[in-house]
Amino acid sequence: MKRLVPLVLMLTFFGFSLEAAKIRLKPGQSLQTAVDQASSGDTLIFSTGTYLVSGVTIRKPLSLIGENYPVMDGENKGNIFLIAAENVLVRGLKFIRTGKSNMDDSAAIKFFDSKNCTVEDNILEDTFFGLHFSNSSNLTIRNNKVKASATREFEVGNGIHLWKCKDNLIEKNEVSGHRDGIYLEFVTNSLAKENFIQGNMRYGLHFMFSHDNTYLRNTFKRNGAGVAVMYTKNVTMQENRFEENWGSSAYGILLKDISDSKVIGNVFQKNTVGIYMEGSSRIDFKENSFKENGWALKLMASCDQNLFQANNFSGNTFDISTNGNLVLNQLKENYWDKYEGYDLNRDKIGDVPYRPINLYSVIVEKIPASVMLWRSFLVTLLDRMEKILPTMTPDEMIDQSPKMRPYDFG
């Protein structure tokens, strides 16, 4: 005990020396040297200016904070920051000019084997990949602006790219001009919310084999092919907006081999196809609005046990189309603006069931060039005849309780 007293007094007296240091950097200084000389927990503060840096490797807990967005210029030489550590913070920096290589996925910031790291309030411009994470967990990716200006898909990588990561928060980022805005593969137990993903060349959001994730209040707008969701289970997509994704292969969402998931309270507006589904099962679609799409829903015959309940369908060219006669899904209590039935008992439910698939949509599915006949008298005549004597549309694709008025989702 007596030996401990001097030690305690010494630690108390010299306590200031044990605190994390703040190290101020100016343009022209070697960032790698500063990182190597810093102790775990130190903060590197970047003064305003341009720093010519590439391949800076960080393997200890550090905070890297910029004042007035100092520029990290990678001089087109590969990655700018490489981070393999826990508890690293990168905030308030501007990154430009990474290398352009698919061999090593050149990125502004590349994390691997990291944990409890935060990247927030940064600007990334004209980088190949923006933020790249692999085999990492407990990441916070918040309020970053990630923008590229390539003209061809192979000239650019993904804006925010995660591979084999878990327990992450991706929040309030803006991503544009990349191949995929956000790309997730083998990512689990994560939340992506309030991101604005616009004008990317392929998908606004693209994920595969990424289970148990939630996507909340994001906007995906004018992306080359919309959003692609593949080979995944236990997904929740709620209160997102999928807008203006136009093209021959563009969708609000493409769902391929998805199961046991929820799509609730979303808006699909002005897309070529609002939702395209293939091989997907046990998904609940509730309280969604499908507005002004070419096709609100393309539901392939390989889908089963899906429920569409209490959704609004308005202003779509086609509400639903399919490629087969077998129907293993349920429509219930949806509002259809094309419904022409009546409500004699005034319970706000139509007394006559509604068949959302018309003959013309079946023909267009089989003969795409026939879309040229849209709004012609022949199409109107065909659809009227099919309503009287249905022969080619699926018998079981029917809403037995259509709503008379649209839902007010607020």
Tell me the role of every PLM-derived stretch.
Residues 203-295:
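Eukaryotic tandem repeat interaction scaffolds
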Residues 21-50:
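Acidic Gly/Asp/Thr-rich repetitive segments characteristic of extracellular carbohydrate-active
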Residues 4-14:
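Sec-dependent N-terminal signal peptides
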Residues 44, 56, 62, 70, ...:
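Solenoid scaffold repeats with emphasis on beta-solenoid/beta-helix
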Residues 248-252, 283-287, 291-410:
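Functionally critical loop-and-helix segments that line ligand-binding/catalytic clefts
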Residues 74-81, 102-111, 126-129, 133, ...:
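Extracellular beta-strand/beta-solenoid scaffold signature
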Residues 32, 40, 51-65, 72-116, ...:
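Extracellular beta-strand-rich solenoid/capping regions of secreted or surface-exposed proteins
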